Curated annotation (Swiss-Prot):
Cellular-component GO terms for this entry: apical plasma membrane; clathrin-coated vesicle; cytoplasm; cytosol; extracellular exosome; focal adhesion; intercellular canaliculus; membrane
UniProt effect for mutating A934T: Found in patients with gallbladder and cholestasis; uncertain significance
Entry protein name: Phosphatidylcholine translocator ABCB4
Consequence of changing R406Q: Found in patients with cholangitis; uncertain significance
ABC transporter domain residues: 394-630, 1034-1279
Impact reported for S320F: In ICP3, GBD1 and PFIC3; uncertain significance; does not alter plasma membrane location; does not inhibit efflux activity for PC
Organism: Homo sapiens
Effect of P479L: In PFIC3; greatly reduced expression; alters efflux activity for PC
Topology feature Cytoplasmic, residues: 1-50, 140-188, 239-296, 355-711, 777-831, 874-933, 995-1286
Gene: ABCB4
Compartment list: Cell membrane; Apical cell membrane; Membrane raft; Cytoplasm
Membrane topology according to the record: Multi-pass membrane protein
Record domain ABC transmembrane type-1: where: 57-359, 711-999
Amino acid sequence: MDLEAAKNGTAWRPTSAEGDFELGISSKQKRKKTKTVKMIGVLTLFRYSDWQDKLFMSLGTIMAIAHGSGLPLMMIVFGEMTDKFVDTAGNFSFPVNFSLSLLNPGKILEEEMTRYAYYYSGLGAGVLVAAYIQVSFWTLAAGRQIRKIRQKFFHAILRQEIGWFDINDTTELNTRLTDDISKISEGIGDKVGMFFQAVATFFAGFIVGFIRGWKLTLVIMAISPILGLSAAVWAKILSAFSDKELAAYAKAGAVAEEALGAIRTVIAFGGQNKELERYQKHLENAKEIGIKKAISANISMGIAFLLIYASYALAFWYGSTLVISKEYTIGNAMTVFFSILIGAFSVGQAAPCIDAFANARGAAYVIFDIIDNNPKIDSFSERGHKPDSIKGNLEFNDVHFSYPSRANVKILKGLNLKVQSGQTVALVGSSGCGKSTTVQLIQRLYDPDEGTINIDGQDIRNFNVNYLREIIGVVSQEPVLFSTTIAENICYGRGNVTMDEIKKAVKEANAYEFIMKLPQKFDTLVGERGAQLSGGQKQRIAIARALVRNPKILLLDEATSALDTESEAEVQAALDKAREGRTTIVIAHRLSTVRNADVIAGFEDGVIVEQGSHSELMKKEGVYFKLVNMQTSGSQIQSEEFELNDEKAATRMAPNGWKSRLFRHSTQKNLKNSQMCQKSLDVETDGLEANVPPVSFLKVLKLNKTEWPYFVVGTVCAIANGGLQPAFSVIFSEIIAIFGPGDDAVKQQKCNIFSLIFLFLGIISFFTFFLQGFTFGKAGEILTRRLRSMAFKAMLRQDMSWFDDHKNSTGALSTRLATDAAQVQGATGTRLALIAQNIANLGTGIIISFIYGWQLTLLLLAVVPIIAVSGIVEMKLLAGNAKRDKKELEAAGKIATEAIENIRTVVSLTQERKFESMYVEKLYGPYRNSVQKAHIYGITFSISQAFMYFSYAGCFRFGAYLIVNGHMRFRDVILVFSAIVFGAVALGHASSFAPDYAKAKLSAAHLFMLFERQPLIDSYSEEGLKPDKFEGNITFNEVVFNYPTRANVPVLQGLSLEVKKGQTLALVGSSGCGKSTVVQLLERFYDPLAGTVFVDFGFQLLDGQEAKKLNVQWLRAQLGIVSQEPILFDCSIAENIAYGDNSRVVSQDEIVSAAKAANIHPFIETLPHKYETRVGDKGTQLSGGQKQRIAIARALIRQPQILLLDEATSALDTESEKVVQEALDKAREGRTCIVIAHRLSTIQNADLIVVFQNGRVKEHGTHQQLLAQKGIYFSMVSVQAGTQNL
């Protein structure tokens, strides 16, 4: 008789949000995936189960079968009991108030009912135990397996070779770690138990049906194949649409992660609307698919209910015929009818379980595919040679190479190079000629296409991969630090390093002094990607990290590029010392740093065209000679004043070199990534939940108010559907009443009428169920799209201090964006329809029941609060569980994101195992929560299931008493019972949404906190002045500033400076002195503070207007920025350049002109797809110099009034720098320009040079004036020029 339970089971189905996987496959694979649904085998899904899991699943399955058999068995008892009622009470035609208690049949009836009550109670006790074991054991087994799958998947990602990351879209891998694996969790947990329960109910129902009355069973079964076919079609349609929907959400997730990861670039170029449009485009696609899914699924559902009611009509018509002809008793007919009905409905209950399982198989296909992917270069492999000692002789033999992602673009074209043990070989050449590629091949990040690389005469492919990388120390041009302490970052160099060794390495790298000035010293957290440190500080820590490794082979790829003048000579000396006795390969654009190398190899077009010592190559007058000449002319401050003949001077000139400005990351980068500044990789996210105000559900629904017509139609249909069940109860009690004494012809006539009524109810239910599901489904899809869009828009609106918060790292925000909206929809949309339906069901049932028998109604209603309290307790406990789970998975997600984003550094440092162990440690929390959830869910589920059996016992025993005492008729007992119990079961189903509701409330609270947060600097604000005329005068007046995340570290301490229209202001000073902070304040990433009583009037002026009073969008539109670490987006070169001006459509001609001005056009023309070439994630497919030139083109296309150049030419090689410098000089004409540079030769023509020290202006004037002062600037120029003799 579990009609309503079945109905609810059928009506429930996964919403689009539940299918919100984020796919991490290449775009090519994605396109393929949308066409065909790929799934793994059923048993393969459980491949990570051990004997304990198998035991849990086996016992869970046995108990699910026992639980599922309970209802059909109860129907046998119900049938026999009905016969007793009809035989004992039905043969008497006494008025309602007449008492049977004095008559013998009454006493017999009470005795019989007591016996049946014991049967019901016994079944209830069995169900109580079975349901608990079924749910809790399957949930436990799922929790254990999911922990292993997460672990294996993360291990598999870390194990892949770098070429795999080039081809696959890594931005989606973290979302896959959370979302896709959650889908597997959904599919292999309690829903499998529910499936077996439904299957057991199905078979038990039909077996009971055949035993008790095969004729009626066969007639009812005639309609079953059609029902089964409609269920199969439904499942197939759902699966196909879910798959397409997942792909659309995956693309949206990738857009969001990319934009949030490059938030400063997005804000500086006013790209928020463009990013939002890109995001919304994918969301719109997902919404459309979701709506089509709702239409298809609900037509199938309407047909299913039409068929179900048609089967009622047929069954009652034929059953009544058999009873009237005395072939069956009424009890037999009822047993057969309800057993078959329950069996058929269980198919409906199994449908969502099948769907969840299908989703899990789809998600697992890609997850397991990555797990099973065996890389050619496996860093976890134990195979390979591990010699006891390595001399360090290196040899390249005819090496050819092209990157996997651009196989048709050859980088190395027959490279031959020999390096003797202990030798230092310098690789020089233009940007993109293959120097850095050589360094990557030595580390076996890639294998050559042809040729071999040997160490000590052995092919490096014969060495153990981990061993090979451990003997190599690397300092790259873009040093990546991890979000932990300085000490821990240096420990990544070598696992078992002591504090003394750390201090020694730090002193050698000239970082000791600045570390000791920090409040937390070695325990200072560096922020995400080292954002809390300046570029020079980061670079020195990276050098210390390499030195502590004590490597046999040292690879220095622009190792001193980010150092200021004060540090570079000392660090260069430290590196010279570190090179002693080691084979060293140095890449440098600044040729003075490599003059003393044993061998200098000149690269051109992927081959070495010349090699020899400095003096030998100068005599040859080839590539090297040409590069030196170009550089010398650029670096002499004034040839008559500085002589560079001194060898010593040349070496000291070194580090600031060519790239010196690239990737300085200076204090500027207190950026977004200071996110992690407070908490290291061991992120504590306790604060995340602390101040989240609860949100009423009404507030969430208000976001759906524009869809009110859908809600009105849907609610009316839901109420109608809710009323169908009590209507069924009324008809059902009337049918039983027919079989009392009376004329058979009249009985048959009445049965025919009731059968037609059933058919009519079926036709109504087709329309009402379709409309209910479709309207709420569509409204739910619109809400999900709206919530995601609003959340992303709200994130893009926030000020920089919000992104600096450790809780708002890219990984955490991406995870929240992917899950919060989905979880809110999990408790709205179609779920809301079911709640409305179930409330209508119970409400109508109670009203009818009070009319027909208030005494029995009151008894039954006493059961309802118990079920309700059980639901509330479950919700409270699961809410706490959901909160902890969310928090702990975010912490794990941060570790995963950091490792995946910086995979090259992780691999170079051989720290894959370290990151894996940290991730695994963070998985213990979610696992512990899943264990608690298993028991809570098991207990509450079993109570709600067993209460129905206990209520049968109480109801019919008390019902017998009421009949015997003349208070009710048997038909009324049946009516009241079926109306109330089915209503209560519906309420139980409503309470089963408790976990979803708990998650939804928490997610909604987070979303509304985000929506309602008013940023200090609102990027979307329309307020503020938008002057018609803007000259470009800038004044800083006593500006005091500290970064919000490090309020106790002063950056600017009373800064005053002035730039007139059209002037070029150059800012110079040591790394971390506040130069880039000036640029950030101009961009209004932050507003200045008043630090002391002396600076109460501190403010920032542009053209006499306080910057705060200008419209922030208008202000940023006047500024063009080229930063030291250019971030490009994973789209075409043309799109990246056009990103410079997001206020209009930029023409192709303008793009080409800007590219020519930035000297990148000739390179682009050599690419197969030219301007349509994709640059890869963060521009990884391009060299540093190529990226920088595209960034310059991007700034030039903006035609800004004020140009901000923060180390704009830092990544350029000798050939390009001069041309680009000329282009920038030209671009500066008529514009106010602020230039930050370590290489002082690039700024000698500035109108005003300002020397910073400790956040204040120490000197200012022209180049000549400052030289004449013989102060700080004079010393810096002297050091760079290589002599103190002026």
